[in-house]
Amino acid sequence: MKIFYCDGSTRGGKNQKGADNIGGWGAVCFSDESEMHIEAFEHDSETYTTNNRQELKGLLWCLYYADDFHPNEECIIYSDSAYVVNMCNSWIYNWATNGWKTSKKQPVENIELVQDIWKCISKPFYHCTIKKCDGHKGILGNELADALATQSMHIFDDLCKEYEVTIGEEE
């Protein structure tokens, strides 16, 4: 069995869109039969990103990884995001049935990510369970995923500082 942890993070404002919201996600995978430990992260330079968007990207990596490399193996994906867990275990089924509208008849946010997740979890032989874990409580996998999400934003900041470029005409 594979066990995944995923996390998302933004610098700026939690789930408030803002031009300076640089985001990142992190994910780790553990195996109970071996000492496999895979880490992945990505910074996201899109502006106006949110924590929820980054949380979804981390989850999507876990789903893709499980499907690509362990298609018939049970897995558990842990997230400290109530949004991610509730979406996967409840809301998404209603959204798909209701034309991707929320219970308040509003369009689902992050629709492209949500629909990609739906493609994964609606497969006939879907094999992942998505569970909630407490964030920042010393759970190794969650702490590692959080560190990767945070690290990805710092890498982006460092690259921006190292390669400052002015575009336009010189005076």
Task: Locate the predicted segments by residue.
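Noncatalytic linker/hinge segments flanking ATPase motor cores
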Residues: H43-S45, Q115-K123, E169-E171
